[in-house]
């Protein structure tokens, strides 16, 4: 068993759907979790596919919710965005950017390869101070409500296995191989240092 609670981060593009669904499920299971996005702005589906609604990361989930409610209650209820923002508001005030976080984690899950690349690049650009390892694991999760939920449960299962592991460093590769076979997904994995 790990001597302390596993510290987990989940990162997607905007810190709205995939990372927050995982945040919600991991938190309910009692895990120490934070969630983040990596882009410069939060982008939500707009009136047309090529016209997203764009917010600054300083905008709270409640402000986004109220803005979309005013713009088109029916559209944003139907596509699930109001439900997502309501859930998010119950977890934390607003989205956070990974690049602005100075906390350390044991494991960071990313939800798409471009986010994985950004997280690894950011960690490698920081000055190493403690040399504490952090495992960065990418799992491709489509940005849909259903896929976010399925991905969150898989992340939760991996975290619970790691939490029960006698030696995370030795067991992680084998665990990821088992999960790849079980889920039919392949994972990217690397180790960075704080």
Swiss-Prot record:
BP GO annotations: mRNA processing; termination of RNA polymerase II transcription
Catalytic activity annotation: O-phospho-L-seryl-[protein] + H2O = L-seryl-[protein] + phosphate; O-phospho-L-threonyl-[protein] + H2O = L-threonyl-[protein] + phosphate
Keywords, sorted A to Z: Hydrolase, mRNA processing, Nucleus, Protein phosphatase
Recorded GO CC terms: mRNA cleavage and polyadenylation specificity factor complex
Main location (coarse class): nucleus
GO molecular function: RNA polymerase II CTD heptapeptide repeat phosphatase activity
Enzyme superclass (EC): hydrolase
Superkingdom of origin: Eukaryota
Family matches, as Pfam families: Ssu72
Subcellular locations according to the entry: Nucleus
EC numbers, comma separated: 3.1.3.16
Summary of the function given for this chain in its UniProt record: Protein phosphatase that catalyzes the dephosphorylation of the C-terminal domain of RNA polymerase II. Plays a role in RNA processing and termination.
Similarity comment: Belongs to the SSU72 phosphatase family.
Protein name: RNA polymerase II subunit A C-terminal domain phosphatase SSU72 like protein 5
Species of origin: Homo sapiens (Human)
Classification lineage: Eukaryota, Metazoa, Chordata, Craniata, Vertebrata
Gene name, Swiss-Prot/TrEMBL: SSU72L5
């Amino acid at each position: 068993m790990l001597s302390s609670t596993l510290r987990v981060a989940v990162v997607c593009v905007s810190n709205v759907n995939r990372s927050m669904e995982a945040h919600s499920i991991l938190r309910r299971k009692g895990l120490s979790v934070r969630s983040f996005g990596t882009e410069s702005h939060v982008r939500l589906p707009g009136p047309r596919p090529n016209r997203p609604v764009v917010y600054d990361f300083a905008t709270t989930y409640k402000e986004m919710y109220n803005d979309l409610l005013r713009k088109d209650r029916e559209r944003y209820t139907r596509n699930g965005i109001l439900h997502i923002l309501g859930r998010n508001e119950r977890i934390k005030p607003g989205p956070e950017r990974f690049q602005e976080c100075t906390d350390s984690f044991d494991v960071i899950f990313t939800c798409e390869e471009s986010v994985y690349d950004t997280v690894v690049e950011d960690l490698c650009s920081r000055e190493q101070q403690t040399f504490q390892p952090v495992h960065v694991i990418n799992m491709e999760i489509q940005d849909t409500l259903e896929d976010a939920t399925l991905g969150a449960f898989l992340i939760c299962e991996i975290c619970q296995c790691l939490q029960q592991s006698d030696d995370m460093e030795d067991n992680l590769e084998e665990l990821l191989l088992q999960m790849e076979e079980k889920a039919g997904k392949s994972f990217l994995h690397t180790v960075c240092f704080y």
